[in-house]
Amino acid sequence: MKLHNITLKGLALGVLFVASSCSDDFLDTKPDGLIDADDVNATMQKDPSLVQSYLTGAYMNFYNGGEWRTSHDIYGIQGLRIALDMMTDDVTLPRNAQWFSFDYQLDNRMSSYRRTTATWRELYQVINDANTVIEFLKPADDSEPEGDVRKMLGQAYALRALNYYYLINMWQQPYSVNPDAPGVPVKTESEYRPERVPVKEVYDQIISDITTAYSYLEGQNITDKSSISEYAAAFIYANVLMFTGDYAGAAEWAEKAIKGGRLNSNADMLSGFNSLDMPEVLWGYKVDTENTSYYGSFFSHVDTYMPGYGGQVGYRKLIASELYDQIADNDIRKKWFGYEEDYNLLEVDFSYEQGNGWLPYLSNKFRDKYLTSLGAEGPFTSDVIYMRVAEMYYVAAEAYYLNNQPEKAQEVMTAIMSTRVPGYTCTSTGDALYKEICVNKRIDMFEEGSRLFDIKRRNESIDRALSENAPIAQLDYINAVKYKGQDDKMIYMIPDAEIQNNPEITVQNP
């Protein structure tokens, strides 16, 4: 179905574009008046600030889920990333209750559940926002956009690519399993394919979008880390190519992304991961008292010492002992874990963990600004970090290894790990080198949402029984202890609401 024209209600443009980007009211089959699409496009080209609210809205909807935010565990991308991490072997939830417990039990994928329905809607909501920006700003004569138009278009294309990347990898098995498998519907600014578009064709759209995004963003010198830059676009590109098996390309794009930041110092590593000013950050969301989602927020669930769900409420997420045991004592990341009296300013009770011998597994990696500033900042106003250059070092190292360039993999590992472990030099070879890359990525990216996609891409065999702080008896009862990354339980089912309203979807996931 081609969308050749846009019809707009006969409102003054200056009023129309102040509206929130989460609305589709600009589409109207029976308008009071018509504005030609070319006229709209020309107006936007002259004054792209008229479209800024849509791009701003896209970023906000990505952060908090917009109108589809339904509860304290469904609040945009960071809620989803916690859910994805809970499906892995990195994190344990000893009490196996409260928010994210069904994700931990690998039992939150059914077509009627909140997780699948809200996530589907949240991701497509951002895609719709991006489509609106592209439709309004894309030059009608296919000329090269310039200035702010070029920057805004680049960001919109990158957002669209990223959201399709999440959709295709949560609703279908990895590209390598079957490129022809039914994927997800694809909407762009000019075309809507409501059927389950094959996996390869979804990836073709993603690669086309992220290629365009990077070409528009390159050299634009976007220094505001709450906006997607060329380095953030390269980050997306590298991860996409890891799934398609283009390891030479993945290494190349990861190296480009790495140029956008510098590795953390020891002080940075222990700062609480709560500010976009951290040197490794490429992209994130600036949170303040106006846009915080408070208890339904990332730091409410991951800060061990705050009055949130992961702190005073008591449903703490611990590092799996199997992973913790692989962190060297002289590794700065070891200090991300274990009870710290100086951090416990609100006197949170840890008697449950202490009684079970689990104090070493408490997480200190994420600490809210409210505590690190000693109350100078508001509660749960910590910035949310989406991308760090550290991840790209591990992506580059793995890509080099898989592309039969072990010396390059060693070089990249030495570069990042020497900032984590004093005097580190990577000399491992063969399988030991690959394990070193994968394990250190798990440690570095703890609770940052990357682990599940790695498990799926590699089809890893997971055994949660290797961690003594996991509630194995409860997990075993529901068959959530041992599994493989490409088991059916690792993909979501298409939401009932989508199937009921979209007759073109005729195949459901198992």
Predicted regions and their residues:
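Sec-dependent bacterial lipoprotein signal peptides
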Residues: 1-20
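Membrane-proximal, proline-rich intrinsically disordered regions
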Residues: 3, 22-79, 254, 314-315, ...
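Short, surface-exposed recognition loops and adjoining beta-strand edges that mediate ligand/DNA contacts
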Residues: 38, 72-89, 93, 173-180, ...
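Hydrophobic-face positions in mid-chain alpha helices that act as interaction patches
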Residues: 191, 251-385, 389, 444, ...
